[in-house]
A protein has these predicted regions:
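Helix-helix packing/entry segments at the starts of transmembrane helices
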Residues: 10, 67-72, 139, 143-155, ...
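Membrane-interface interhelical linkers
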Residues: 16-42, 91, 141-143, 154, ...
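Cytoplasmic-side transmembrane-helix entry/capping segments in multi-pass membrane proteins
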Residues: 34-45, 89-101, 118-123, 142-154, ...
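Transmembrane alpha-helical segments that form core, pore/gating elements
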Residues: 1-4, 19, 112-169
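C-terminal-most transmembrane helix of multi-pass membrane proteins
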Residues: 214-235
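Hydrophobic transmembrane alpha-helices of multi-pass small-molecule transport proteins
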Residues: 92-108, 231-235
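Hydrophobic/small/kink-forming positions within alpha-helical transmembrane segments
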Residues: 20, 44-52, 74-79, 104, ...
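Structural signature of hydrophobic alpha-helical transmembrane segments
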Residues: 3-15, 56-73, 115-128, 172-186, ...
């Protein structure tokens, strides 16, 4: 019952508060250095575009198909890191990416009932995420991870605010709790991935994106009693 942009707004509002607190505690620059503004803005813009396009794809495709398209982002990260960050990738890493993508397909089991516009949105979402993650790696020694998360969060909050004001639904206590919980767990993920790209190569970190599928299976079993089939276990 909660509109899309309201969910995105709350998700990033929680991250904004946490990042601001950490910045004040560490005395890191709130908006970063002037010379890095373009990279920070680009990272925030591509990150937000990836989220919105992903939500659009999910709304118009089967969940399996939209998830499959989203899992192409590590491939985009690898390509862009090689081209723009001059990171080297060996044959084993390339094989590893395609093996894990194949395993993801076994778990997701896409139906390939793809409509053209939502499919393009899903593909662009993966590309936007790939660019955003590559920019995270570029900023690794230039800005604090707290500053990067704050910048992304405040841009996302400001960009989604007009849509929220236009179509705001007052959440009940349960919905508010779920929105805040979503924001909290998303914040943990956002800080985790930002620190990961700070300390390791983009080509090495990106493949761990597929671990979300494993956690999804485990959580689905614990909370919703979903039993994975043989293909999912094989994947």
């Amino acid at each position: 019952d909660i509109p899309l942009f309201e969910k995105v707004f709350f998700r990033n509002l929680v991250s904004l508060v946490i990042a601001f607190y950490l910045i004040k505690k560490s005395s890191a620059p709130v908006f970063g250095q002037r010379k890095n503004q373009l990279a920070l803005l680009a990272r925030a813009g591509f990150g937000l575009a990836g989220v919105i396009l992903n939500f659009y794809a999910i709304s118009h495709l089967t969940l399996a198909d939209s998830t499959m398209l989203g899992k192409l982002s590590p491939i985009f990260v690898t390509i862009m890191a090689c081209l723009f960050l001059k990171e080297k990738i060996d044959k084993e890493q390339i094989i590893g990416i395609f093996i894990t993508f194949g395993g993801a397909l076994l778990v997701i089991k896409p139906e390939f009932s793809l409509s053209i516009i939502p499919s393009i949105a899903g593909l662009l979402s993966a590309a936007a995420a790939g660019i955003a993650y590559t920019l995270l790696r570029y900023l690794k020694d230039k800005e604090s991870p707290d500053t990067i998360v704050f910048y992304f969060s405040i841009v996302s909050v400001l960009e989604t605010l007009p849509f929220v004001l236009n179509d705001y639904i007052v959440p009940d206590s349960t919905q508010l709790m779920l929105l805040l919980a979503t924001g909290l767990f998303a914040s943990v993920g956002q800080f985790g991935i930002t620190y990961a790209y700070k300390y390791s190569k983009a080509t090495e970190v990106s493949i761990y994106n597929y671990s979300a599928i494993v956690f999804g299976i485990i959580l689905g079993f614990i909370f919703f009693h979903e039993i994975p089939d043989m293909l999912s276990l094989l994947g």
